[in-house]
């Protein structure tokens, strides 16, 4: 009976250890994905509408610009 209890305890410890390693691997992977890469930093995109566009612009649309920085866009 002691042997059975010992084997059961060992099996549970091995299972818990494997589960802890899997959780740690997922946490490490998530931390790596959250860190911005060197090529992502400082990258900005700016879009402006050409004055010679096919459709004429109204007074309120003149000078309308969109600036996107790190996935966040805003109109100026």
Swiss-Prot record:
Keyword match Disulfide bond: yes
Keyword Chaperone attributed: no
GO cellular component: extracellular matrix; extracellular space
Keywords of the record: Antibiotic, Antimicrobial, Defensin, Disulfide bond, Fungicide, Signal
Cysteine disulfide links: 68-73
Covalent crosslink: Cyclopeptide (Arg-Cys) (interchain with C-73 in subunit A): 65
Any one Pfam family match given in the protein's UniProt record, by short name: Defensin_propep
Cyclopeptide (Cys-Arg) (interchain with R-65 in subunit A) crosslink location in chain: 73
Membrane-spanning residues: none
InterPro entries: Alpha-defensin (IPR016327), Alpha-defensin_N (IPR002366)
PANTHER family hit by this protein: ALPHA-DEFENSIN 1 (PTHR11876), DEMIDEFENSIN-3 (PTHR11876:SF34)
Stated name of the protein: Theta defensin subunit C
Organism: Papio anubis (Olive baboon)
